[in-house]
Curated annotation (Swiss-Prot):
Compartments, as annotated in UniProt: Membrane
Residue intervals passing through the bilayer: 447-467
GO biological process: terpenoid biosynthetic process
The keyword Protein biosynthesis appears for this protein: no
Protein name listed in UniProt: FAD-dependent monooxygenase prhF
């Protein structure tokens, strides 16, 4: 389909800033709806190698399948079927939760090189002339009946709405705040401007295959202030990350930056840390193909939009990689925004592109997505601190509750995944498993109560632990 054909079918024009997973997925969604759009990417290429990888869970997989893309991704990595967990006292346990998730939903959990994800999204995109690289955005101008985005080379792109899919260092977020401060002082709160904080850093790496790390399995190795998580391909790569607690908490944008030397230094400091019985961090580093180190911002904004500007993905909610939901949450954002834009595009030109219509749409977008994104963010935050044994409570929960809470963890995972958002105007695949029908997207998620429910489970275990220690002391 040519660009002209898209324009004939929809007068609505969307400017997407950021050739990210969120941005390119939104472009695919809009192409399916014949909504005119353009993608502006500041880098010279869409898919650079940065050493990072992405976990795709059933909630993200279902959206990619709606777009006809999932088979391309599934072929890149064997599904995860077994999780192995290791604690510093030598205790280990295994869980087939990933296999059960696949059986219930019809989609496995897979981990893929982020470069490959972006490459596939771009190569399968039908209107490549709509994706422009070397387009660093300098400012956004509100035009009353539209909006204009000006890039570093002096080009101006006009549309009805600007979507900031440009990540944690979002230029569009900065412009949204600037314009709101100029026109409606106080609308953007100081809390939102300081919403992103950093307490952890992470070394992401991709290594050559190590024989003792079996394909289709992944390992979580926990310690105090540190965790290492690996995913193992078949005759291929090992994806891994080392997450470490930093000495002090900082607030974005005054957060640390790290070099390749920093990544090497961290991995050298933890070289003897055991990932498994036979593999240490030094083995992952010695066999690495690429690696990078980054600060891990965490936070979620209370205001996602202003006027004709809206944020999605990491530009509005940022989480650690511990529960693998960052990219999946961005995919859900894209699916909901595209569904609302599709509905809007069916109105008359005047009604569909008016300031009132845009404000109503963006209000609905945030109200639809906020609670679920906030719950996912909070669960990720809790997961990072559970995995790094951040305090006594989380240490005890991780060691004495988590290994024995399999059915409850499964139940909560199923409910969370089954209530995920999707593209409303595209059909589902026949491969959908039975779990999707067990809950509707209108069912309230319970993710936000994770710490309280875990504490309730912990108390009996804690009393038993103390009783055992007391008996041991008395008998000695």
């Amino acid at each position: 389909m040519s660009q002209a054909t898209v324009e004939e079918k929809s007068k609505l024009r969307v400017i997407i800033v950021g050739g990210s997973v969120a941005g390119l997925t939104l472009a695919h969604c809009l192409a399916k709806a014949n909504i005119d759009h353009i993608v502006l990417e500041k880098r010279a290429e869409i898919s650079p190698q940065e050493g990072a990888f992405i976990g795709i869970w059933p909630n993200g997989a279902r959206i990619l399948d709606q777009l006809g893309l999932y088979d391309d991704f599934e072929s890149l990595m064997p599904p995860v079927h077994r999780m192995n967990v290791r604690f510093p006292d030598g205790f280990t346990f295994s869980s087939f939760l990933p296999r059960t998730i696949q059986e219930r939903f019809g989609y496995p959990i897979i981990s893929i090189d982020r470069q490959k994800v972006l490459e596939t999204l771009y190569e399968r995109y039908p209107h490549k002339s709509n994706v422009l690289v070397n387009k660093k955005v300098m400012n956004v101008r509100l035009l009353g009946k539209g909006v204009s985005v000006v890039t570093e080379d002096g080009s101006a792109y006009n549309g009805d709405i600007v979507v900031g899919a440009d990540g944690i260092h979002s230029r569009i977020r900065s412009e949204m705040w600037r314009l709101a401060d100029e026109n409606h002082p106080g609308l953007i709160t100081s809390e939102d401007k300081q919403a992103f904080t950093v307490e952890y850093a992470c070394v992401f790496g991709i290594s050559e295959q190590l024989p003792s790390l079996r394909a289709g399995e992944h390992i979580n190795s926990y310690s105090n202030g540190l965790c290492v998580i690996t995913f193992h391909g078949e005759k291929g790569r090992i994806f891994w990350f080392l997450l470490v607690k930093l000495p002090k908490k900082t607030t974005y944008p005054n957060t640390p930056r790290f070099s390749a030397g920093d990544a090497a230094s961290v991995c050298n400091n933890f070289a003897t840390f055991r990932v498994s019985e036979d593999v240490c961090v030094s083995d992952l580093w010695m066999h690495k193909l690429c690696a990078s180190m980054t600060a891990l911002e965490e936070g979620i904004l209370e205001r996602w939009h202003y006027d004709r500007i809206v944020l999605l993905g990491d530009s509005v909610h940022k989480m650690t990689p511990n529960i693998g939901q960052g990219a999946n949450t961005a995919l859900e954002d894209a699916s909901v925004l595209a569904s609302l834009l599709n509905n809007l595009s069916k109105l008359s030109t005047e009604d569909g592109t008016s300031a009132y219509a845009m404000t109503k749409l963006l209000d609905e977008f945030q109200s639809t997505r906020y609670e679920r994104a906030k719950n996912t963010h909070d669960k990720s935050r809790f997961g990072a601190r559970l995995h790094t044994r951040d305090d006594m409570i989380k240490t005890l929960i991780g060691r004495y509750v988590f290994p024995y809470a399999g059915p409850r963890v499964l139940e909560r995972s199923v409910k969370s995944l089954a209530t995920a958002h999707s593209v409303e105007y595209l059909p589902f695949s026949k491969r959908l498993g039975p779990a999707w029908g067990e809950y509707s997207s209108r069912t309230k998620s319970t993710l936000g109560s994770t710490p309280i429910q875990m504490l309730t489970l912990l108390l009996p275990c804690l009393f038993y632990f103390m009783y055992s220690k007391l008996n041991l002391s008395l008998s000695s």
